[in-house]
Amino acid sequence: MEKLEKTLEEWRSMLDPEQYNVCRLKGTERPFSGKYNGTKTDGVYHCICCNEPLFDSKAKFDSGCGWPSFYEPIADSAMVEIRDMSHGMIRTEVVCAKCDAHLGHVFPDGPPPTGLRYCINSVCLDLVPR
């Protein structure tokens, strides 16, 4: 996959303020505030920054955490996992493999078949219905 690289100023001009804060500055949207938290529409969730496919709606589940949750990405190559030791916690951050947009975190408390919960900020996603 060819990387998409832009300066922070280029990203700022392309994204709205909340998208920029979350995707480029590793912010987090408020729980239960994102437009995809309760969405059940069939489709594919793409990266808001580069349009790379990230998650299939078939892998989405209601975790009750306040953010869209998925038990697996659309492909292992779609994202990169990074150890995150911010805020006094040890977590695993997930970023888009193509453009390095911060997406959220993955936790080992999800449902079968993977046991994983990808907890993703809605503002980082664009749902393309089937």
Swiss-Prot record:
Q: Which residues form the MsrB domain?
A: 8-130
* Catalytic activities: L-methionyl-[protein] + [thioredoxin]-disulfide + H2O = L-methionyl-(R)-S-oxide-[protein] + [thioredoxin]-dithiol
- Which BP terms in the Gene Ontology apply to this protein? protein repair; response to oxidative stress
Q: Which UniProt keywords apply?
A: Metal-binding, Oxidoreductase, Zinc
Give me the comment on cofactor binding. Answer: Binds 1 zinc ion per subunit. The zinc ion is important for the structural integrity of the protein.
| Pfam entry (one) | SelR
Q: What class of enzyme is it?
A: oxidoreductase
What Enzyme Commission number(s) apply to this enzyme?
Answer: 1.8.4.12
Q: Which InterPro entries match?
A: Met_Sox_Rdtase_MsrB, Met_Sox_Rdtase_MsrB_dom, Mss4-like_sf
A GO cellular component annotation in the UniProt record:
cytoplasm
Q: Which PANTHER family match?
A: METHIONINE SULFOXIDE REDUCTASE, METHIONINE-R-SULFOXIDE REDUCTASE B1
* UniProt-recorded name of the protein: Peptide methionine sulfoxide reductase MsrB
Source organism of this protein record: Pseudomonas fluorescens (strain ATCC BAA-477 / NRRL B-23932 / Pf-5)
